[in-house]
Protein backbone atom coordinates (compact mmCIF):
# COMPACT_ATOMS: atom_id res chain seq x y z
CA UNK A 1 0.00 0.00 0.00
CA UNK A 2 1.32 3.43 -0.94
CA UNK A 3 2.08 5.82 1.95
CA UNK A 4 -0.69 8.30 1.06
CA UNK A 5 -3.31 5.53 0.84
CA UNK A 6 -2.16 4.14 4.19
CA UNK A 7 -2.48 7.57 5.82
CA UNK A 8 -5.94 8.04 4.28
CA UNK A 9 -7.08 4.65 5.60
CA UNK A 10 -5.82 5.40 9.12
CA UNK A 11 -7.43 8.85 9.23
CA UNK A 12 -10.72 7.45 7.88
CA UNK A 13 -10.74 4.67 10.45
CA UNK A 14 -10.03 7.10 13.32
CA UNK A 15 -12.75 9.48 12.10
CA UNK A 16 -15.31 6.68 11.81
CA UNK A 17 -14.45 5.59 15.36
CA UNK A 18 -14.75 9.16 16.67
CA UNK A 19 -18.19 9.42 15.04
CA UNK A 20 -19.47 6.34 16.87
CA UNK A 21 -18.25 3.48 14.71
CA UNK A 22 -20.02 4.46 11.51
CA UNK A 23 -19.19 2.55 8.30
CA UNK A 24 -16.33 3.37 5.96
CA UNK A 25 -17.15 3.24 2.25
CA UNK A 26 -15.29 3.85 -0.98
CA UNK A 27 -16.80 6.89 -2.70
CA UNK A 28 -17.79 7.14 -6.31
CA UNK A 29 -15.50 9.81 -7.80
CA UNK A 30 -18.44 11.34 -9.70
CA UNK A 31 -21.14 11.33 -6.99
CA UNK A 32 -21.73 14.49 -4.98
CA UNK A 33 -23.50 12.74 -2.11
CA UNK A 34 -22.38 9.68 -0.16
CA UNK A 35 -23.66 6.20 -1.01
CA UNK A 36 -24.97 5.80 2.54
CA UNK A 37 -26.60 8.45 4.74
CA UNK A 38 -24.03 8.37 7.56
CA UNK A 39 -20.60 7.10 6.55
CA UNK A 40 -16.97 8.10 6.20
CA UNK A 41 -15.74 8.01 2.62
CA UNK A 42 -12.12 6.97 2.02
CA UNK A 43 -10.79 7.30 -1.51
CA UNK A 44 -11.08 9.94 -4.21
CA UNK A 45 -14.08 12.01 -3.17
CA UNK A 46 -15.20 15.04 -5.17
CA UNK A 47 -16.27 18.14 -3.26
CA UNK A 48 -17.86 21.07 -5.05
CA UNK A 49 -16.79 24.13 -3.12
CA UNK A 50 -16.63 27.85 -3.57
CA UNK A 51 -13.53 28.05 -5.78
CA UNK A 52 -13.46 24.87 -7.86
CA UNK A 53 -14.28 21.18 -7.66
CA UNK A 54 -11.67 19.48 -5.50
CA UNK A 55 -10.84 15.85 -4.75
CA UNK A 56 -10.19 14.87 -1.14
CA UNK A 57 -9.00 11.57 0.33
CA UNK A 58 -11.33 11.28 3.34
CA UNK A 59 -14.70 13.01 3.59
CA UNK A 60 -17.64 13.00 5.99
CA UNK A 61 -20.69 14.70 4.49
CA UNK A 62 -23.99 13.60 6.04
CA UNK A 63 -25.66 16.95 5.32
CA UNK A 64 -22.95 18.72 3.36
CA UNK A 65 -19.24 18.60 4.00
CA UNK A 66 -18.41 18.42 7.71
CA UNK A 67 -14.87 17.03 7.35
CA UNK A 68 -12.46 16.93 4.42
CA UNK A 69 -8.93 15.49 4.60
CA UNK A 70 -6.14 15.34 2.08
CA UNK A 71 -2.75 13.68 2.48
CA UNK A 72 0.24 15.18 0.72
CA UNK A 73 3.33 13.06 0.25
CA UNK A 74 6.52 14.43 -1.27
CA UNK A 75 8.55 11.26 -1.75
CA UNK A 76 11.97 12.31 -3.01
CA UNK A 77 14.35 15.22 -2.62
CA UNK A 78 13.81 16.55 -6.13
CA UNK A 79 10.04 16.58 -5.59
CA UNK A 80 10.37 18.36 -2.24
CA UNK A 81 12.67 21.06 -3.62
CA UNK A 82 10.60 21.57 -6.75
CA UNK A 83 7.04 21.20 -5.46
CA UNK A 84 6.77 22.17 -1.80
CA UNK A 85 5.71 25.77 -2.51
CA UNK A 86 3.08 24.59 -5.00
CA UNK A 87 1.83 22.14 -2.37
CA UNK A 88 1.44 25.00 0.14
CA UNK A 89 -0.58 26.97 -2.42
CA UNK A 90 -2.74 23.88 -3.00
CA UNK A 91 -3.44 23.56 0.73
CA UNK A 92 -4.66 27.15 0.95
CA UNK A 93 -6.82 26.74 -2.15
CA UNK A 94 -8.30 23.45 -0.95
CA UNK A 95 -9.19 24.94 2.44
CA UNK A 96 -10.72 28.00 0.76
CA UNK A 97 -12.72 25.80 -1.62
CA UNK A 98 -14.36 23.95 1.26
CA UNK A 99 -14.74 26.82 3.73
CA UNK A 100 -16.30 29.22 1.21
CA UNK A 101 -19.27 26.91 0.69
CA UNK A 102 -19.19 25.02 4.01
CA UNK A 103 -17.81 27.47 6.61
CA UNK A 104 -18.43 25.07 9.52
CA UNK A 105 -16.56 22.21 7.85
CA UNK A 106 -13.26 20.97 9.24
CA UNK A 107 -10.36 20.75 6.81
CA UNK A 108 -7.30 18.73 7.76
CA UNK A 109 -4.05 17.95 5.97
CA UNK A 110 -1.20 15.57 6.67
CA UNK A 111 2.06 16.38 4.91
CA UNK A 112 4.66 13.59 4.85
CA UNK A 113 8.25 14.33 3.83
CA UNK A 114 11.29 12.00 3.95
CA UNK A 115 13.87 13.20 6.50
CA UNK A 116 16.84 13.32 4.05
CA UNK A 117 14.88 15.68 1.79
CA UNK A 118 14.14 18.34 4.38
CA UNK A 119 17.06 20.59 5.26
CA UNK A 120 17.60 24.19 6.35
CA UNK A 121 16.42 26.78 5.43
CA UNK A 122 13.60 24.97 3.60
CA UNK A 123 12.73 22.94 6.70
CA UNK A 124 12.07 26.04 8.79
CA UNK A 125 10.26 27.82 5.93
CA UNK A 126 7.92 24.88 5.28
CA UNK A 127 7.23 24.37 8.98
CA UNK A 128 6.54 28.05 9.62
CA UNK A 129 4.19 28.34 6.67
CA UNK A 130 2.26 25.20 7.64
CA UNK A 131 1.93 26.51 11.21
CA UNK A 132 0.44 29.74 9.86
CA UNK A 133 -2.02 27.80 7.67
CA UNK A 134 -3.15 25.64 10.60
CA UNK A 135 -5.37 26.07 13.65
CA UNK A 136 -8.47 27.69 12.17
CA UNK A 137 -10.43 28.08 15.39
CA UNK A 138 -13.77 29.41 14.18
CA UNK A 139 -15.97 29.38 11.09
CA UNK A 140 -15.52 33.14 11.12
CA UNK A 141 -11.73 32.88 10.72
CA UNK A 142 -9.79 32.94 7.47
CA UNK A 143 -11.11 30.50 4.88
CA UNK A 144 -7.61 29.64 3.65
CA UNK A 145 -6.64 28.03 6.96
CA UNK A 146 -7.15 24.40 7.98
CA UNK A 147 -8.41 23.28 11.35
CA UNK A 148 -5.55 20.79 11.63
CA UNK A 149 -2.31 20.14 9.77
CA UNK A 150 0.37 17.64 10.65
CA UNK A 151 3.89 17.58 9.26
CA UNK A 152 5.34 14.09 9.42
CA UNK A 153 9.06 13.82 8.76
CA UNK A 154 9.99 10.17 8.34
CA UNK A 155 13.06 8.03 7.76
CA UNK A 156 12.69 6.05 4.51
CA UNK A 157 15.23 3.45 5.71
CA UNK A 158 13.50 2.54 8.98
CA UNK A 159 10.00 3.91 8.37
CA UNK A 160 10.17 5.71 11.72
CA UNK A 161 8.81 9.19 12.33
CA UNK A 162 11.35 11.85 13.34
CA UNK A 163 10.57 12.66 16.97
CA UNK A 164 12.64 15.87 16.90
CA UNK A 165 10.87 17.72 14.07
CA UNK A 166 8.60 19.60 14.14
CA UNK A 167 9.63 20.96 17.52
CA UNK A 168 7.71 19.75 20.58
CA UNK A 169 5.81 23.04 20.89
CA UNK A 170 4.58 23.00 17.28
CA UNK A 171 0.89 22.56 16.44
CA UNK A 172 2.06 20.36 13.54
CA UNK A 173 3.10 17.42 15.74
CA UNK A 174 1.38 14.18 14.68
CA UNK A 175 0.59 13.48 18.35
CA UNK A 176 -1.73 16.52 18.37
CA UNK A 177 -3.48 15.89 15.05
CA UNK A 178 -6.41 13.71 16.18
CA UNK A 179 -7.07 15.82 19.27
CA UNK A 180 -7.19 19.02 17.20
CA UNK A 181 -9.75 17.43 14.88
CA UNK A 182 -11.87 16.06 17.72
CA UNK A 183 -11.84 19.36 19.63
CA UNK A 184 -12.86 21.39 16.57
CA UNK A 185 -15.51 18.87 15.52
CA UNK A 186 -17.15 18.76 18.94
CA UNK A 187 -17.11 22.56 19.20
CA UNK A 188 -19.03 22.85 15.92
CA UNK A 189 -21.27 19.78 15.83
CA UNK A 190 -21.75 18.39 19.36
CA UNK A 191 -25.34 17.30 19.89
CA UNK A 192 -26.32 17.68 16.23
CA UNK A 193 -27.65 14.80 14.12
CA UNK A 194 -26.87 12.30 12.74
CA UNK A 195 -24.85 11.31 15.82
CA UNK A 196 -26.48 13.48 18.50
Residue ranges and their predicted role:
Residues 1-43:
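Acidic-basic catalytic patches of nuclease active cores, encompassing PD-(D/E)XK
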Residues 29-38, 113-118, 156-158:
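Short, internal active-site loops enriched in acidic
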Residues 73-123:
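Catalytic cores of nucleic-acid endonucleases
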Residues 119-196:
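Non-catalytic C-terminal interaction segments of nucleic acid-processing enzymes
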Residues 68, 108-111, 151:
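Structural beta-sheet core signal
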Residues 39-54:
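N-terminal low-complexity, intrinsically disordered segments
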Residues 51-69:
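Active-site beta-strand-loop-beta-strand hairpin of nuclease catalytic cores
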Residues 16, 99-100, 141:
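N-terminal cationic-hydrophobic initiation segments that often serve targeting/anchoring roles
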Amino acid sequence: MELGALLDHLVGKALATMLGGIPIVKPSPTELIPQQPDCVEVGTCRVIGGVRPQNFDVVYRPDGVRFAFDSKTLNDCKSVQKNYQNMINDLGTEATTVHTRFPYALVAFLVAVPHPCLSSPQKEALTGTLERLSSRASPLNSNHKAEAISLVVWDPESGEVDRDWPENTSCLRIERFSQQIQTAYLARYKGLPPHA
